[in-house]
Amino acid sequence: MRSAAFSLPFCDWKCRRRLGAADKWPLLKRSFRILPPLIAGGATTEVKEVEKFADEEDFIKAGGSELFFVKMQERKPMEKQRKIADELTKISSGDPMLDLIVIGCGPAGMSLAAEAGKRGLSVGLIGPDLPFTNNYGVWEDEFKGLGLESCIEHVWQDTIAYLDSSDPILISRAYGRVSRHLLHAELLRRCQETGVGFLDSKVEKIIEASDGSSIVVCEGDLMLPCRLATVASGAASGKLLQYEVGGPRVSVQTAYGVEAEVGNNPYDPRSMVFMDYRDHVKGKIISDEEYPTFLYVMPISSTRVFYEETCLASRNAMPFDRLRSKLMSRLKAMGVSILKIYEEEWSYIPVGGSLPNTEQKNLAFGVAASMVHPATGYSIVRSLSEAPQYASVITNILKRNSNSSQNNVIGSSYNPSVLAWRTLWPQEGKRQRAFFLFGLALILQLDIDGIRIFFQTFFRLPDWMWQGFLGSTLSSAGLIWFAFYMFAIAPNSLRICLIKHLLSDPTGSTMIREYLTL
């Protein structure tokens, strides 16, 4: 559901057929014809993308056929956010070797850099100096638990969902909209206070030196040495990291949104609409190859509203122009008139896919480390909450190595990074992720009626159970209880689908194997 988002072989009832094979790698070399953004207006634009990616999956993670819009989202102007380069000391090639270089300047990278600096490490932050542009939605209690409640700009005490009737499901959990500039300012302040350095540059590669240290190669062949490098540069990090071979194919959650001044808004501004799966365009025939979408609504006031049409997950990204068309059709059918558009949003979240190779020396964090919840698309709370512990582990590794009588840098015969990887992805975490991947594969197979039945059942679970599922706080054993409870209260049609899915989908056997691994 949102960067906040949610995510049977064949079942007997209304399960959609599998789509064909993905577009082949030459897709990268094509030109894409793009519809214009609503605010800018103008003619259709032709864009040629020339960026280099590690492979086809890396290209898909970066945005695939929707890459133009992903780049537009990244580069939206955010005047309230200060440039990182204006606040942090610039890193240069003549500086002493850094303990840690964090590659990537999103919330995950900045939080990890600040936490590592807080623990006494010399830290460098490297990446394009871009603002936070995504509209993050979070459960208020989770952000309060991180001490970041001051970064929430709007809170709805009531959260609701509509599935197939006008009677909402009351979720009874406060939901907040994160202020992008306040969160950016807070993380930047933490980096500044802990002495983190910064370089506004893309990273081309990471080289392991003969003494076991790492050399981060930036644009212009600028080489910066460090004792450890951690990649937090987003999903498309295949040039810098190795990922497990033979894992599940990555799926994608896409959403197109507008924040607008509107007339005849039908939603109560006191409530946040987590999902609205109702069919507002009556009688419309949905293509067999089209995934269902829902409306996500943040009413800032009775007339200023953020509407977002969201495809929970799909094997091939639902195009943004299709989502925009669906959103406008939905709003028109609801009688909503758009008077002024303040902002457009193009949200692209890869979900699922392979874990990083946990035997490699280079570390990862955030989305690059596959920390996105496979079944929901959430990641920011997990990244911010795990940054302190991860920074502590990295600090202990480096201090332990410094105290070694054999070497003052990381020796080539021993890979201490394995300890950090095991902290980030212990066997317990792999079991949980396998369960979520099983849920993602289930969602991918359901049509609109199946999804409605699934969520009707889901929100009948005890609050602590469904909240734990969304927040990744249920243990692997707790997830088994979740499955049993879900099965017990589900209608027979959903039970049959769950059984068939477990027995026939590869994610079922993978989940069982992970649960049996000690």
Curated annotation (Swiss-Prot):
Keywords: Carotenoid biosynthesis, Chloroplast, Isomerase, Membrane, NAD, Plastid, Transit peptide, Transmembrane, Transmembrane helix. Catalyzes the single epsilon-cyclization reaction which converts lycopene to delta-carotene and neurosporene to alpha-zeacarotene. Required for lutein biosynthesis. It catalyses: a carotenoid psi-end group = a carotenoid epsilon-end group. It is found in: Plastid, Chloroplast membrane. Its main location: plastid. NCBIfam families: carotene-cycl. Its EC number is 5.5.1.18. Expressed in leaves and roots. Detected in flower buds and lips. NAD(+) binds at residues 100-128. GO terms for biological process: carotenoid biosynthetic process. Pfam families: Lycopene_cycl. This is Lycopene epsilon cyclase, chloroplastic. GO terms for cellular component: chloroplast membrane. PANTHER family: LYCOPENE EPSILON CYCLASE, CHLOROPLASTIC, PTHR39757. Pathway: Carotenoid biosynthesis; alpha-zeacarotene biosynthesis; Carotenoid biosynthesis; delta-carotene biosynthesis. It comes from the Eukaryota. GO terms for molecular function: intramolecular oxidoreductase activity; oxidoreductase activity, acting on paired donors, with incorporation or reduction of molecular oxygen. Belongs to the lycopene cyclase family.
